[in-house]
Amino acid sequence: MAENTMWHETLHDQFGQYFAVDNVLYHEKTDHQDLIIFENAAFGRVMALDGVVQTTERDEFIYHEMMTHVPLLAHGHAKHVLIIGGGDGAMLREVTRHKNVETITMVEIDAGVVSFCRQYLPNHNAGSYDDPRFTLVIDDGVNFVNQTHQTFDVIISDCTDPIGPGESLFTSAFYEGCKRCLNPGGIFVAQNGVCFLQQDEALDSHRKLSHYFSDVGFYQAAIPTYYGGIMTFAWATDNDALRHLSSEIIQARFHAAGLKCRYYNSAIHAAAFALPQYLHDALSAQ
């Protein structure tokens, strides 16, 4: 791709977004997907897979803080964390900030993502790949959760959209495997797209997860990079109380963890579970 051109996202047929390409840093087709990182004056370094924006330096902190601190602080004493995907290292970066976590396992299907993100997205991983608690496994996520003998307190599915390599991470086989290796009272979370534009994705996840967990819901965050703005995250656990913890409890845990965030706080945590009526109506209609 030439520099000083426009890169157009291909996620939606009838509408979308574009980024000016100031400088292409990396572009390669791996065995699994088409990877590109380019620089944009407004959003910094932008990474896309198969024509879909995955992350930008400008706003990645919102996504990663919400996918890690919400389940970890709701759980309260997570020791073992599993990340599915997350090859850019930012999810790992946020989990490593929790000093009580003892092991962090990341399963990434594409070794190429990890290697080039270490070089081209250093602000994302911020040295977290060198944390002694971290183990990298190159494997298919569905295979791992159905075969591993390890168990986890929190599982974070940092999956791409349900197309291409990421499609298997939205299947019943994956959700069943996650339930299999989740400790009692554990929490599973996953990105579930922009619900206003991809509502079927959320409904499908809710329907499938409900077969394996007693408490299934969603929480949301405003992330400009993802077209439509309001990203939805799936939430699943067998401890019904964890979704309804008071902001005072979350604030106490947040303070004890010594965290300082740019987006996440205890009020955001509580408010994130307040969903728009159209989603409540759609879930009730299933």
Swiss-Prot record:
Q: Which UniProt keywords apply?
A: Cytoplasm, Polyamine biosynthesis, Spermidine biosynthesis, Transferase
How would you classify this enzyme at the top EC level?
A: transferase
Provide one Gene Ontology biological process annotation. Answer: spermidine biosynthetic process
UniProt-annotated location(s): Cytoplasm
Which pathway does the protein contribute to? Amine and polyamine biosynthesis; spermidine biosynthesis; spermidine from putrescine: step 1/1
The PABS domain covers 5-238
Q: Locate the active site.
A: D158
This chain's protein is named Polyamine aminopropyltransferase
